[in-house]
A protein has these predicted regions:
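N-terminal Rossmann-like dinucleotide-binding module
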Residues: 1-52, 306
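Predominantly a Rossmann-like dinucleotide-binding segment in NAD(P)-dependent oxidoreductases
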Residues: 12-13, 129-209
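Active-site loop of classical SDR/Rossmann-like NAD(P)-dependent oxidoreductases
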Residues: 41, 237, 289-303
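Beta-loop-alpha module in the N-terminal Rossmann-like domain of NAD(P)-dependent dehydrogenases
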Residues: 53-115
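Rossmann-fold dehydrogenase core element
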Residues: 111-129, 149-153
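Contiguous beta-strand/loop segments that form the cofactor/metal-binding neighborhood of enzyme cores
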Residues: 179, 186-262, 302-312
Length: 334
């Protein structure tokens, strides 16, 4: 199988650049890593990553974009710079993987999608739950009609982060709704489709004197129900309470926790647990549960990217990604 020659532009402290680079390097049967670039003074801002990248060729952005043998690029800069470099990659005619959801500028995102469409380039975004095996199972079962009419999706993705990371949320409209809530909006949109209205509800807790929107929330209205997402950056124990709950007329599915690391520190692979109930007759019906085999969220994501670069139909179209980005901004009050 032909390897895809790929480079990475950028990394960041609070997103997944180092994990994506590690996945590219480890999946040697899929990728040949040409090198990396650290724009925007990332050497000075993120010295903790130098050792990880040191064995690979340091390049400039211009060297990556002008190298005809490099056919794909992962853009993993800080969020505010994502669309700047993504557009450069697309204009250079290279396939693109980009950290989610992009910089908070709709015109720039529309321009990016237009370039990608015109050049027929692969486009992948870092929405990690798309490749969670239990999420994939849930989406398949919803699509099959097993739950009947769906009237509610609830999704939570919370954590307890440092004062410094909560201050960083000032970079975005809606704070946590933009930063992590976008993962959940992706799930709501896949299951429920186009909402009739979006109600942004993000707030600042003010804890530690930080006045960013560290409590993200949004409600999505539909003709036959309501769905909501919540992403708090101040929730003690929030990681294991991350969930996706889908309620239909015939039954309910709940993935909780959405991810769990059962073997830290020996292994950073995750598992996910599906809970389900289809007993409509018993008031206190018990839920059954099943936990997935261990998986790596980034390996599955980048394997999918390799497949669409090679010509597999992208399950997430350009138009889907654009409309999702618009919904994310609406949920953030923009």
């Amino acid at each position: 199988m032909r390897k895809i020659k790929i480079a990475q532009i950028g990394t960041s402290r609070y997103s997944h650049g180092s994990s994506i680079f590690a996945s590219l390097c480890e999946q040697k049967e899929l990728f040949e890593v040409a090198g990396y670039a650290f724009p925007e003074n990332e050497d000075e801002k993120f010295p903790e990553f130098k050792e990880q990248y040191a064995p690979y060729r340091r390049m400039t952005v211009e060297e990556i974009l002008s190298d005809p043998t490099i056919e794909a690029v992962a853009v993993e800069t800080e969020e505010v710079y994502l669309l700047k470099y993504a557009k450069m990659v697309a204009k250079a005619g290279k396939h693109l993987h980009m950290e989610k959801p992009g910089s908070p500028n709709l015109d720039d995102f529309r321009e990016l999608v237009s370039i990608l469409k015109e050049k027929n380039l692969a486009f992948s975004l870092g929405y990690m739950y798309r490749f969670n095996p239990k999420v994939k199972e849930l989406l398949s079962r919803v699509k099959s009609g097993e739950l009947g009419k769906i009237f509610s999706v609830e999704a939570q993705m919370s954590c307890k982060h440092s004062k410094e990371q909560r201050a960083f949320l000032s970079d975005f409209p809606g704070g946590m709704t933009f930063f992590l809530g976008c993962h959940l909006i992706d799930l709501v949109y896949q299951i429920m489709g186009e909402p009739t209205a979006v109600l942004p509800l993000s707030r600042s807790t003010g804890i530690d004197g930080v006045h960013t929107d560290d409590l993200g929330m949004a409600v999505f209205q539909y003709e036959n129900g309501i769905s909501f997402i919540k992403a708090s950056d101040n929730e003690v124990g929030g990681f294991l309470r991350r969930n996706l709950i889908v309620t239909g007329e015939r039954g309910s599915l709940a993935i909780q926790p959405l991810e769990y690391y059962p073997a830290l520190p020996e292994s950073d692979k995750q598992t996910a647990t599906m809970n389900e109930c289809f007993d409509t007759a018993v008031w206190q019906a018990e839920w059954t549960k099943e936990t997935s085999l261990p998986f790596d969220r980034y390996d599955s994501m980048m394997k999918n990217f390799a497949e669409i670069v090679r010509g597999k139909e992208n399950p997430y179209s350009y138009d889907y990604e654009l409309r999702l980005f618009e919904l994310v901004l609406q949920a953030c009050g923009k």
